[in-house]
């Protein structure tokens, strides 16, 4: 949105605007669709820390000790991978358990969530007129 003249076209996939309600859905709401995966995700934290999954996961993810951050990263990434498709996919599950992917994915997502993607709330939607003339396609899968 900041430099629309530098963009010829948009191909969008997995649209997530990082609004508070979307973060809430990721952290808590998806338990209505994937209760088993959510239980494992939330169960990584002690019961007294489950009321604020983001803060407590983030604290672990930024801990310099691999014995602290890697289990949290793997739990976060496993949850993300398991909930990214409607039906279980062993290849996706395996990919999301790669340590390199898990740590980067979990840290980046949690960092952006904690910082509201470094933008004022709804900034992307409020400024959509800036990119309205750019051709685009949304690729979405089940």
In which residue ranges do the predicted regions lie?
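Generic, well-ordered alpha-helical scaffold segments in large soluble proteins
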Residues: 2, 6, 112, 130-131
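A catalytic-pocket lid/entrance helix-loop region that shapes and gates access to the active site
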Residues: 2-58
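Generic recognition of stable, solvent-exposed alpha-helical segments in well-folded globular domains
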Residues: 52, 71, 104, 123-126
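Accessory cap/linker subdomain of secreted extracellular hydrolases
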Residues: 55-96
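Short, hydrophobic/amphipathic alpha-helical patches that form generic packing surfaces
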Residues: 75-85, 103-114
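Secondary-structure capping and boundary motifs in well-ordered enzyme cores
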Residues: 98-105, 129-130
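Active-site nucleophile elbow and catalytic-triad environment of alpha/beta-hydrolase enzymes
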Residues: 111-128
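Short beta-strand/loop motif that positions the catalytic acidic residue
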Residues: 131-132, 137-140
């Amino acid at each position: 949105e900041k430099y629309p003249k530098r963009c010829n076209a948009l191909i969008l996939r997995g649209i997530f605007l990082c609004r508070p309600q979307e973060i809430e859905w990721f952290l808590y709401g998806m338990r209505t669709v994937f209760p088993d995966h959510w239980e494992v995700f939330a169960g990584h934290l002690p019961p007294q820390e489950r009321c604020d999954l983001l803060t407590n996961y983030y604290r672990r993810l930024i801990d310099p000790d691999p014995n602290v951050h890697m289990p949290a990263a793997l739990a976060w990434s496993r949850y993300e991978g398991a909930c990214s498709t409607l039906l279980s996919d062993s290849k996706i599950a395996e990919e999301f358990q790669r340590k390199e992917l898990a740590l980067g994915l979990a840290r980046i997502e949690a960092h952006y969530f904690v910082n509201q993607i470094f933008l004022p709330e709804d900034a992307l939607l409020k400024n959509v007129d800036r990119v309205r003339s750019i051709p685009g396609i949304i690729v979405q899968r089940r």
